[in-house]
Structures are given as structure tokens and as C-alpha cells.
Swiss-Prot record:
Residues 54-354 are lumenal. The conserved DXD motif is involved in cofactor binding. The manganese ion interacts with the beta-phosphate group of UDP and may also have a role in catalysis. An alpha-L-fucosyl-(1->2)-beta-D-galactosyl derivative binds at residues 233, 245, 303, 326. Changing residue 235 to S: In allele Bw08. The keyword Phosphoprotein does not apply. GO terms for cellular component: extracellular region; Golgi apparatus; Golgi cisterna membrane; Golgi membrane; vesicle. Keywords: Blood group antigen, Glycoprotein, Glycosyltransferase, Golgi apparatus, Manganese, Membrane, Metal-binding, Secreted, Signal-anchor, Transferase, Transmembrane, Transmembrane helix. It is a single-pass type II membrane protein. It catalyses: an alpha-L-fucosyl-(1->2)-beta-D-galactosyl derivative + UDP-N-acetyl-alpha-D-galactosamine = an N-acetyl-alpha-D-galactosaminyl-(1->3)-[alpha-L-fucosyl-(1->2)]-beta-D-galactosyl derivative + UDP + H(+); an alpha-L-fucosyl-(1->2)-beta-D-galactosyl derivative + UDP-alpha-D-galactose = an alpha-D-galactosyl-(1->3)-[alpha-L-fucosyl-(1->2)]-beta-D-galactosyl derivative + UDP + H(+). This is Histo-blood group ABO system transferase. This protein is the basis of the ABO blood group system. The histo-blood group ABO involves three carbohydrate antigens: A, B, and H. A, B, and AB individuals express a glycosyltransferase activity that converts the H antigen to the A antigen (by addition of UDP-GalNAc) or to the B antigen (by addition of UDP-Gal), whereas O individuals lack such activity. Glycosyltransferase that catalyzes the transfer of carbohydrates to H antigen, forming the antigenic structures of the ABO blood group. The gene is ABO. UDP-N-acetyl-alpha-D-galactosamine binds at residues 121-123, 126, 211-213.
Length: 354
């Protein structure tokens, strides 16, 4: 290019061509820059083949015009919480009690006529936890909003009858059981991905995917809704990344080196928009199938693959351990102002084994 410009500069008769040539050079540079920096190159699908984190669009709540509301003014110089991290390095909120105004959020999502799907797997002996799960969900989960429960089970007749509130419904989705509890856990990703295509995309706006051997003890509402969220594991929220139980074997698709990692997310509470949940569950299932073909199983099964996915595709919100806690094992530390969704005491070996 420099030689071309020097040649043209040495020919006085070509002065009239200079503006046209400069224009063409600028056009080429602009088109090249667009190709490199185009937002399409930052989409999740391309990033799985590339090297940088996925960038997602915001929740679009700014499109809603709120009515007049009276509430305490947020104060720029007074942080809502001084004892915990409330935002990630990629500017995703970390949701703790005291960091949000639920009245504002309820109004925003109500005006959007949002429907939330809640998926839960009640396979084999785990069907025994379903009644308490559903009864407490009716008291605390997305109260005042439209909810669709999706119960995946191998025993449709054993699903209890629970009185549901207005705008709330339940669908029973019959699925097969697997011999090992690990396979039941891992196959959840495949089943959720399949039903995203078959039903969820046309029936709900957001999906929340949780474990069944739990109970809701306090408010769990629209403050969690976002394109993609994960939940901090109650056993690791104060730990360094070196202590996380990531999959450390390079042969696995879930492998994370010891010098990488933001947080350790648990597999029992994740979600987001249906489109994002479909991407997540499909990617995790495909990764597990590659591992299976290579004769390796990640240390914590689907949870290991979930952590790998959320490392490469940063969540747009992170839920604090308030949203899944085991009080029997961990007590109630002062940093948790509320225990919202807690483990039911049980003998793990008894419920996991036939």
C-alpha cells in the first residue's frame, strides 16, 4: 500500500485521482474494522469457538413506563451493603437482601406480563419431596406473578395435588429413570434443553431450574430474573479459586485450570431467559456426551460442566447463597439476612440408592 501511494505521489498528472484513491482506502479500512469488531463476532455461538466472554443484551426493562411510586431515595454515597461484594468485575449484580427494591421490580415485570417456568426433577425416591416443595413454592416463589411448574418424573401418578393460586399451573412431564443418581443428575441438562424447544419457548419467558429436595422459606421473586444467572455455592462463597472443586483433569470438557475461575456455582439453582437456558443446557449436555465418548466423567457431573459454561459465558446476575442454603450443615451466618431456599434434612444414601 505504501509503494502505491509513493508512486501516485510522484506523478503530478494524477492529482485528480488522489481523493478517489484515499476514499477507497478509507472504505476498505472501515469495512475491515467492521468485520473485526462487529457485535456478531461477540455472540455466544461464536465465542464457544473463540476466546472471549459472551456479551448479552440487558433485560429491556427500560421499555416499561412505571406509574408514580413513592419509595426511599437511593443514596450514591451510602452503599446498600458494606459486608459483601454486590457487583462482579463484569458488572453483573450479586443479589443479596438489601440490594434491591422489590416493589419497583414487581411493577416492572407485572407490566411486562411475565411468565416464569420452574423446572424440578422428582425421579425415583425424590418424588417424596415434591409435596413440601410445591406447597412452600406457592407461599414464596414469584408471588403475584404467572408461574408454570414443570415436574419431570418417572411416576406421574405420585405427583401430589396441591392447590395453586391464580395464574399458576402445573404440568407433569413423564421421563425415564436411570439406574445411577449421577445419570439422573446429568440427563437433566438434556431433558431441559429438549423441552425448551418443544414447549418452554412458547409457554414462558424465563426458566428457573432447581433441586426438589428443598423448601422455600422466604421470598424468591423477580429480583433473580435476567438473561442468565447462577447461584453461589454455600460451601465455597468465601473460598479462593484454588479451593473450588472444579474439574481439574484436562481430558474433560469441564476442565478449569487452577489459575482460572470467578465463583463456584451450584447445580441446584440456575436459570434465565428460555433462550439462554436452552444454550446452557444444550452446551453442557453436548460436553458430557464428549466426555462419555472419551471414557471420562466430570468430578461433580453436570455441576462441573455448568461451572465451565458460566466461566466462559458470564452470567448477567449472580445469586447469593441466600438462594440455596443448608442450615443443618452450615448454620446461619450473619452475612445471610435471609434464608430463602433451603435443603430438607435427609439421608442422601437412602434416597439415592434403589
Amino acid at each position: 500500500m505504501a509503494e502505491v501511494l509513493r508512486t501516485l505521489a510522484g506523478k503530478p498528472k494524477c492529482h485528480a485521482l488522489r481523493p478517489m484513491i484515499l476514499f477507497l482506502i478509507m472504505l476498505v479500512l472501515v469495512l475491515f474494522g467492521y468485520g473485526v469488531l462487529s457485535p456478531r463476532s461477540l455472540m455466544p455461538g461464536s465465542l464457544e469457538r473463540g476466546f472471549c466472554m459472551a456479551v448479552r443484551e440487558p433485560d429491556h426493562l427500560q421499555r416499561v413506563s412505571l406509574p408514580r411510586m413513592v419509595y426511599p431515595q437511593p443514596k450514591v454515597l451510602t452503599p446498600c451493603r458494606k459486608d459483601v461484594l454486590v457487583v462482579t468485575p463484569w458488572l453483573a449484580p450479586i443479589v443479596w437482601e438489601g440490594t434491591f427494591n422489590i416493589d419497583i421490580l414487581n411493577e416492572q415485570f407485572r407490566l411486562q406480563n411475565t411468565t416464569i417456568g420452574l423446572t424440578v426433577f422428582a425421579i425415583k425416591k425424590y418424588v417424596a419431596f415434591l409435596k413440601l416443595f410445591l406447597e412452600t413454592a406457592e407461599k414464596h416463589f414469584m408471588v403475584g406473578h404467572r408461574v408454570h411448574y414443570y415436574v419431570f418424573t418417572d411416576q406421574p401418578a405420585a405427583v401430589p395435588r396441591v392447590t395453586l393460586g391464580t395464574g399458576r399451573q402445573l404440568s407433569v412431564l413423564e421421563v425415564r429413570a436411570y439406574k445411577r443418581w449421577q445419570d439422573v443428575s446429568m440427563r437433566r441438562m438434556e431433558m431441559i434443553s429438549d423441552f425448551c424447544e418443544r414447549r418452554f419457548l412458547s409457554e414462558v419467558d424465563y426458566l428457573v431450574c432447581v433441586d426438589v429436595d428443598m423448601e422455600f422459606r422466604d421470598h424468591v421473586g423477580v429480583e433473580i430474573l435476567t438473561p442468565l444467572f447462577g447461584t453461589l455455592h454455600p460451601g465455597f462463597y468465601g473460598s479462593s479459586r484454588e479451593a473450588f472443586t472444579y474439574e481439574r483433569r484436562p481430558q474433560s470438557q469441564a476442565y478449569i485450570p487452577k489459575d482460572e475461575g470467578d465463583f463456584y456455582y451450584l447445580g441446584g439453582f440456575f436459570g434465565g431467559s428460555v433462550q439462554e437456558v436452552q444454550r446452557l443446557t444444550r452446551a453442557c449436555h453436548q460436553a458430557m456426551m464428549v466426555d462419555q465418548a472419551n471414557g471420562i466423567e466430570a468430578v461433580w457431573h453436570d455441576e462441573s460442566h455448568l461451572n465451565k459454561y458460566l466461566l466462559r459465558h458470564k452470567p448477567t446476575k449472580v445469586l447469593s447463597p441466600e438462594y440455596l442454603w443448608d442450615q443443618q450443615l452450615l448454620g446461619w451466618p450473619a452475612v445471610l439476612r435471609k434464608l430463602r431456599f433451603t435443603a430438607v434434612p435427609k439421608n442422601h444414601q437412602a434416597v439415592r440408592n434403589p
